[in-house]
């Protein structure tokens, strides 16, 4: 049996049936519907399409739980910016494992941040949004993850 490959794909790149499968699974897991038939009817998906994709597509946060994630972040070189970023991460309940900051060149520094997301209290996407919302943050990328 061959090893399964996993890919991180942006939502807008998924087919309509895949997106609707995720919606149906969310309805079921939230208890908003009790049966698969109800879920697929509500999102406008055939049962056969649901069964085709249900075991192969997952929200990013479901895969990312209990993982160590490594982010590459470009920060403007201003006093207190790294502290603000670290506070955002710490406020989620995540455990910061390593921090590596380059010497600021031409007004910006690169931060490599490894974070244990097992204790995180919010969705991983929300963490991305909070980090990107900082005025001093120019870019946030997930560069690796593992157990």
Curated annotation (Swiss-Prot):
Family matches, as Gene3D superfamilies: 3.30.70.260
Domain of life: Bacteria
Domain ACT span(s) in chain numbering: 70-145
Pfam families: ACT
Similarity annotation: Belongs to the UPF0735 family.
HAMAP family the record matches: UPF0735
Protein name (database record): UPF0735 ACT domain-containing protein ABC1543
Native species: Shouchella clausii (strain KSM-K16)
């Amino acid at each position: 049996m061959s090893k399964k490959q996993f890919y991180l794909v942006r939502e807008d790149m998924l087919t309509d049936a895949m997106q609707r499968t995720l919606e149906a699974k969310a309805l079921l897991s939230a208890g908003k519907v009790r049966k698969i038939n109800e879920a697929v009817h509500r999102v406008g998906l055939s049962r056969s399409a649901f069964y085709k994709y249900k075991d192969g597509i997952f929200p990013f946060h479901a895969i990312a739980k209990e993982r160590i994630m490594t982010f590459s972040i470009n920060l403007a070189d201003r006093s207190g910016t790294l502290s603000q970023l670290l506070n955002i991460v710490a406020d989620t309940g995540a455990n910061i494992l390593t921090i590596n900051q380059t010497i600021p060149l031409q007004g910006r520094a690169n931060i490599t941040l490894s974070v244990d997301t097992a204790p995180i209290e919010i969705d991983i996407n929300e963490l991305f949004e909070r980090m990107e919302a900082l005025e001093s943050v120019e870019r946030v990328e997930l560069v690796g993850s593992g157990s």
